[in-house]
Swiss-Prot record:
Its EC number is 3.1.27.-. The gene is PR10.2B. It is an enzyme of class 3 (hydrolase). It comes from Lupinus luteus (European yellow lupine). Keywords: Allergen, Calcium, Cytoplasm, Hydrolase, Metal-binding, Nuclease, Pathogenesis-related protein, Plant defense. Class II ribonuclease (RNase). Binds to several cytokinins including natural adenine-type (e.g. trans-zeatin and kinetin) and artificial urea-type (e.g. N,N'-diphenylurea and N-phenyl-N'-(2-chloro-4-pyridyl)urea) hormones. Interacts with melatonin. The keyword Metal-binding applies. This is Class 10 plant pathogenesis-related protein 2B.
Length: 158
């Protein structure tokens, strides 16, 4: 098994606490409203804390698909949230698990900087596919921007 680590950063005009609330605390409600392709977010196991598994159902290529998302850690005081993709179409056959360690910090002009570390654990001696990595980054960028756009369009959300 190999572990491959990547880091990325997103900037937003939304304040860190407000963005965190939308991305973590109210995610099950906000994400399907903000991200056009996501139909639903539902808890399939757990109570919403670490260890909880959520099913995100979305439309891709005209078909309904899903990913299983496991909450690894929630750190409200430091605006941190760690989760893993543990099943569904978001996990190619060569990948054991994809983990995301996220943290929001204060950005310019009251906005946010989202810092994310992505760890891909492969099965056997498989190597991550570069195209899959680029596609995953593009989905992450689009997701983050969709949440930011939703919050900008709904300034009363807090």
């Amino acid at each position: 098994m190999g572990v491959f680590t990547f880091q990325d950063e997103y900037t937003s005009t939304i304040a860190p606490a407000k963005l965190y609330k939308a991305l973590v605390t109210d995610a099950d409600i906000i994400i399907p409203k903000a991200v056009e392709t996501i139909q639903s977010v539902e808890i399939v196991e757990g109570n919403g804390g670490p260890g909880t598994i959520k099913k995100l159902t979305f439309i891709e290529g005209g078909e309904s698909k899903y990913v299983l998302h496991k909450i690894e850690a929630i750190d409200e005081a430091n605006l941190g949230y760690n989760y893993s993709i543990v099943g569904g179409v978001g996990l190619p056959d060569t990948i054991e698990k994809i983990s995301f360690e996220t943290k929001l910090v204060e950005g310019a002009n009251g906005g946010s900087i989202g810092k994310v570390t992505i760890k891909i654990e492969t099965k056997g001696d498989a190597q991550p596919n570069e195209e899959e990595g680029k596609a995953a980054k593009a989905r992450g960028d689009a997701f983050f921007k969709a949440i930011e756009s939703y919050l900008s369009a709904h300034p009363d959300y807090n």
